[in-house]
Regions:
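Accessory interaction regions appended to the cores of large information-processing enzymes
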Residues: 1-235
Length: 235
């Protein structure tokens, strides 16, 4: 569950979302289980728009959120104070709050980008190349020989392949050729190492807040993501 509330003075919106894992490569999808007599259709349409209008960041590494189904469960507007931008704030915060809750429960997966590659080099350097690819946990097919050169095709993690070029150029003396194509995402095998290496601090990402804003005595005040459930208005 993700809860987002946005209520500085003379503004109001609250959104409750369910975040569910989706099939790999399916991207972000949206559905609503909220009756229109609870939250009017025009506000629900805005929530949907705000789900799709930006690339939402995950809370572990700040990487783009992918392969998630977002379901609107309930929400609330205010007849006098709600403006269109209020549901943008509430929706963004609900997604981040939900991701924080999932991460705290240990159920969050970090997806790493994959690259498909084609590498051509002199056959005498083939052993070094294949040993390096195995070390980087890449998969590849059988080598193809063209005169005195070998061509190898496969796929592997972008995080390691993208930094391999300098080493490759060095031991092939500039005679090797590498070509890469993006090939989707898959769960990282070494998630904790990657999280520590990137060092993303979500509390400092002011453009993607996880907290909500409530109002008391005519003034808005922030509530940390892990306390929002104690303050929400929709039950």
């Amino acid at each position: 569950m993700g809860y987002g509330h946005y209520e500085p003075l003379r503004h109001y919106a609250e959104v409750h979302l369910r975040l569910s894992p989706a099939p790999r490569g399916s991207g972000i999808s949206f559905d609503s289980e909220c009756p229109t007599d609870i939250l009017a259709q025009n506000w629900q349409n805005l929530v949907r728009t705000h789900v799709f209008e930006k690339k939402h960041k995950g809370v572990l590494t700040g990487s783009e959120l992918c392969d998630v189904k977002v379901t609107l469960l309930t929400g609330r507007s205010h007849l006098k104070h709600t403006e269109g931008g209020d549901f943008r704030e509430a929706t963004y915060r609900a997604i981040r709050q939900g991701l924080g809750t999932i991460a705290a429960s240990g159920q969050n997966d970090t997806a790493g980008a994959l690259l498909r590659f084609s590498i051509s080099l002199e056959s005498e350097q083939a052993g070094r190349l294949m040993a390096d690819l195995q070390r980087m946990e890449c998969s590849f097919g059988s080598p193809q020989m063209e005169e005195e050169r070998m061509i190898l095709e496969g796929r592997g993690p972008a995080a390691v392949l993208s930094g391999y070029g300098r080493e490759f150029i060095s031991y092939t003396r500039g005679k090797g050729v590498m070509s890469f194509w993006f090939d989707g995402y898959e769960p990282c095998k070494h998630q904790q190492e990657i999280v520590e290496q990137i060092g993303y601090q979500r509390e400092r990402d002011l453009e993607n807040p996880s907290c909500s804003v409530f109002c008391s005595h005519g003034a808005g005040f922030p509530v940390p993501w892990d306390e929002v459930q104690n303050y929400i208005h929709c039950k």
